[in-house]
């Protein structure tokens, strides 16, 4: 096929991030300069974000059989770029205290962002697999970046081995789907999967294996066992990327697959997904109740959040409100997670060995860093789904689509999960205002609010509050992003 100027405009975010990868790589080869390479990475990601405006002007189109650029792709590309940008800004002060090679960190984040953008645009099982591998491979290095710490190295090895196993399940599942349907394109799959075909054993086995592979990447029960250990062992800025960009990109492509290939029409697949959603919500919240490590706590809570999103995915056949629910919920989850992990990153910067991830490190934070404590409180309230925060709007949407689709037992799970989630989120928030220990173990820099990471954290808190009270701008953006079927 011929690549036209319109196609190149549609691929601008991908091309800009790819070019930034090359520029940063050459810059590292020429001369190691931490500030220069961090700045180049941030400029490249910002340029990719700005280019989305030009992509919108070009309109929806299929760019090669592997990719479709439309409003849906633009929304998820934007969310991935925001998460990558935040990761780079949190990493800069953290790396200032790191004595080994700093610059490769940005290179790995940029390559992972490239994978996320590819996933947001994927319209074919081949591009889905390529995107997942492109986002996973750099994460093996990022998770073990603090390799002199046993916990970080252990997390990296665990994530690498389990991720490779999950990828093999995903690939084998795709092979079985191809054997039955004769095509790997999402649109062709939708056309080829007739009424009777969804009950074919080979096809069900293929989709089942794909659910195992994708369930691992999304930390869904029972494929979640790596999540708390990897979140705890990875450096705080890397945990930010894992919790946000990685999950958002993969969930976005899964939703597009469900939109085009009506897998939800199969009763067997719906039942399996409903059981996974129920188990993720209940187990994620129950395990988070006993955690005293903030990164582990947020790891378990991310399992429950993906369970809530799965409820909206199961209800996808009932209408466009489910797509709206997923978009709003993911935006709320992104800003809340960026704020929470951002505070952990600021408290852990510059690098001084293990991160400040113990709940005790945050005890009495309000008395010497009041604004930082207020930001953390807002994030905990949003993740808990308290009214007047963006997290509440997202959770309300999920409940609404669950009721609309008559998924009563899953609605019950969302209510019970949210109620139990209140306990551990409020426990973190309350500890910020307790009597401070005489000698605090870790603390954020005194001028944290003037750093790039501090500004990102403050903007995230502001967006969570403003969009929680007035969500219409976000809802309008999500509605514009409905894929043009």
UniProtKB/Swiss-Prot annotation:
An individual GO BP term: ATP synthesis coupled electron transport
Membrane topology: Multi-pass membrane protein
Annotated keywords: Cell inner membrane, Cell membrane, Membrane, NAD, Quinone, Translocase, Transmembrane, Transmembrane helix, Transport, Ubiquinone
Cellular component aspect of the GO annotation: plasma membrane
Pfam families assigned: Proton_antipo_M
Catalytic function, reaction form: a quinone + NADH + 5 H(+)(in) = a quinol + NAD(+) + 4 H(+)(out)
UniProt GO MF annotations: NADH dehydrogenase (ubiquinone) activity; NADH:ubiquinone reductase (non-electrogenic) activity; quinone binding
Subcellular localization(s) per the UniProt record: Cell inner membrane
Record field: transmembrane: 8-28, 35-55, 71-91, 105-125, 127-147, 159-179, 203-223, 235-255, 271-291, 297-317, 326-346, 373-393, 408-430, 455-475
Enzyme class of the recorded protein, top EC level: translocase
Enzyme Commission designation: 7.1.1.-
Domain of life: Bacteria
Quaternary structure note: NDH-1 is composed of 13 different subunits. Subunits NuoA, H, J, K, L, M, N constitute the membrane sector of the complex.
Cited function: NDH-1 shuttles electrons from NADH, via FMN and iron-sulfur (Fe-S) centers, to quinones in the respiratory chain. The immediate electron acceptor for the enzyme in this species is believed to be ubiquinone. Couples the redox reaction to proton translocation (for every two electrons transferred, four hydrogen ions are translocated across the cytoplasmic membrane), and thus conserves the redox energy in a proton gradient.
Family: Belongs to the complex I subunit 2 family.
Descriptive protein name: NADH-quinone oxidoreductase subunit N
Organism classification: Bacteria, Pseudomonadati, Pseudomonadota, Gammaproteobacteria, Enterobacterales
Gene: nuoN
């Amino acid at each position: 096929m011929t690549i036209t100027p319109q196609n190149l405009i549609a691929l601008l975010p991908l091309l800009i991030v790819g070019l930034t990868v090359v520029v940063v790589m050459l810059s590292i080869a020429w001369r190691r300069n931490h500030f220069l390479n961090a700045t180049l990475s941030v400029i490249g990601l910002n340029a990719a974000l700005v280019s989305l405006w030009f992509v919108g002007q070009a309109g929806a189109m299929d760019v090669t059989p592997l990719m479709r650029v439309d409003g849906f792709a633009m929304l998820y590309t934007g969310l991935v770029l925001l998460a990558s940008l935040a990761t780079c800004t949190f990493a800069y002060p953290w790396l200032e205290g790191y004595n080994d090679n700093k610059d490769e960190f940005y290179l790995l984040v940029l390559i992972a962002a490239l994978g996320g953008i590819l996933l947001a645009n994927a319209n074919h099982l081949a591009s889905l697999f390529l995107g997942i591998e492109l986002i996973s491979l750099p994460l093996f290095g990022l998770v073990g970046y603090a390799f002199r710490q046993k916990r970080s190295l252990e997390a990296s090895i665990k994530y690498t081995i389990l991720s490779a196993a999950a990828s093999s399940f995903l690939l084998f599942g795709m092979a079985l789907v191809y054997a039955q349907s004769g095509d790997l394109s999402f649109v062709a799959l939708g056309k080829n999967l007739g009424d009777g075909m969804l009950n074919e054993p080979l096809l069900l086995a293929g989709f089942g294996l794909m659910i195992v592979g994708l369930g691992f990447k999304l930390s869904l029960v029972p494929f979640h066992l790596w999540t708390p250990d990897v979140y705890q062992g990875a450096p705080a800025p890397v945990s930010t990327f894992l919790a946000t960009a990685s999950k958002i990109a993969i969930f976005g492509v899964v939703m597009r697959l469900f939109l085009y290939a009506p897998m939800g029409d199969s009763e067997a697949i719906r039942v399996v997904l409903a059981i996974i959603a129920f188990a993720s919500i209940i187990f994620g919240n129950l395990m988070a109740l006993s955690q005293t490590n903030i990164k582990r706590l947020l790891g378990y809570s991310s399992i429950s959040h993906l369970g809530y999103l799965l409820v909206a995915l199961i209800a996808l056949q009932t209408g466009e409100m489910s797509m709206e629910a997923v978009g709003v919920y993911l935006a709320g989850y992104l800003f809340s997670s960026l704020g929470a992990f951002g505070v952990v990153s600021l408290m852990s910067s510059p690098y001084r060995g293990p991160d400040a991830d113990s709940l005790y490190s945050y005890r009495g934070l309000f008395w010497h860093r009041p604004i930082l404590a207020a930001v953390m409180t807002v994030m905990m309230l949003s993740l808990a789904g308290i009214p007047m925060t963006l997290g509440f709007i997202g959770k309300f949407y999920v409940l609404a689509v669950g009721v609309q689709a008559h998924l009563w037992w899953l609605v019950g799970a969302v209510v019970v999960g949210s109620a139990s989630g209140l306990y551990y989120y409020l426990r973190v928030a309350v500890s910020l205002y307790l009597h401070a220990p005489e000698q605090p173990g870790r603390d954020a820099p005194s001028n944290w609010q003037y750093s790039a990471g501090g500004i990102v954290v403050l903007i995230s808190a502001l967006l969570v509050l403003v969009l929680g009270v007035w969500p219409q701008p976000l809802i309008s953006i999500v509605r514009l992003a409905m894929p043009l079927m």
